[in-house]
C-alpha cells in the first residue's frame, strides 16, 4: 500500500511504512473513509498529507522483491494525486514499463488532479456510485433505519455510501441538539433559572 502521510519529524524522510500498522487498523475498523478521516487518525493538525519522494524509492525496492506466492505483485496507491512532483517523476519509468507480473492500482478521488504524464501511462476505470436501493437496504438491515428514512438518505447520498453514513451521524447529532433545545425551552418556560444555569 501507498497512501498520503504527514511528516513525523523535521529533516527525516517519512514513508508509508511508518504508518502501516495504523493504516491497517484504520481500514479494518471502517472501510468507508476519506482523506479527512485518515488525517484525523494520523493526528495531523494543520499538516498536509502527501506521498513524499522517498516513497518512490520504497516502491521500487518493494517491487524488486519476489512475490510471496509466486504470482502477481500488486501496488495499490491510494490518492495518487497527493504525490509530490518529485515522487511522480521518479515513478514515471516504472509505471511505463513495470516489471513482469506487476500491477499498479491507482485509486483516486480526483483523477484529473494526477499529473498528466502519469495519467498518460495508465488505463482509467471510472467506478460508478452504489445504486439507491442497495444503499437503502444496507441502511435498514445494518443500521436499523426505517424504510422511508433509508430511502431518503440513499437518495441524498448520490451513490456515495460514505456520504450516507455521514448523513446518519448528522441526523443523530441533530436529534440530540433538538432534545437539548426542547429541555432548555421547557426550563425557560417554567422559569427555572437555577437549572438553566446548570444546563
What residue spans do the PLM features occupy?
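Clamp-loader machinery-focused feature within the broader ASCE/P-loop NTPase space
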Residues: 1-86
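Charged, glycine-rich active-site and insertion segments that engage polyanionic ligands
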Residues: 100-103, 109-199
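Conserved adenine-binding aromatic site and its adjacent loop/helix in ATP-hydrolyzing domains
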Residues: 61, 93, 120
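Residues immediately C-terminal
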Residues: 82, 97, 113
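Conserved catalytic/switch belt of AAA+ P-loop NTPases
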Residues: 64, 89-100
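Loop/turn-to-beta-strand initiation segments
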Residues: 69-74, 99-105
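Generic recognition of short, well-ordered alpha-helical segments
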Residues: 86-90, 117
Amino acid at each position: 500500500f501507498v497512501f498520503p502521510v504527514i511528516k513525523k519529524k523535521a529533516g527525516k524522510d517519512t514513508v508509508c511504512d511508518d504508518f502501516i500498522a495504523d493504516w491497517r487498523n484504520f481500514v479494518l475498523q471502517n472501510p468507508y473513509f476519506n482523506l479527512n478521516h485518515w488525517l484525523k487518525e494520523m493526528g495531523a493538525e494543520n499538516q498536509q498529507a502527501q506521498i513524499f519522494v522517498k516513497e518512490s524509492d520504497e516502491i521500487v525496492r518493494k517491487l524488486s522483491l519476489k512475490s510471496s506466492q509466486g504470482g502477481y505483485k500488486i501496488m495499490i496507491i491510494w490518492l495518487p494525486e497527493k504525490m509530490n512532483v518529485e515522487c511522480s517523476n521518479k515513478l514515471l519509468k516504472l509505471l511505463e514499463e513495470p516489471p513482469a507480473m506487476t500491477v499498479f492500482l491507482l485509486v483516486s478521488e480526483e483523477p484529473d488532479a494526477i499529473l498528466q504524464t502519469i495519467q498518460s501511462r495508465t488505463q482509467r476505470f471510472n467506478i460508478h456510485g452504489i445504486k439507491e436501493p442497495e444503499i437503502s437496504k444496507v441502511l435498514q438491515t445494518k443500521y436499523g433505519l426505517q424504510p422511508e428514512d433509508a430511502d431518503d438518505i440513499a437518495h441524498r447520498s448520490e451513490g456515495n455510501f460514505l456520504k450516507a453514513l455521514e448523513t446518519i451521524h448528522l441526523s443523530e447529532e441533530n436529534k440530540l441538539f433538538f432534545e437539548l433545545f426542547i429541555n432548555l425551552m421547557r426550563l425557560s418556560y417554567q422559569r427555572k433559572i437555577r437549572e438553566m444555569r446548570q444546563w
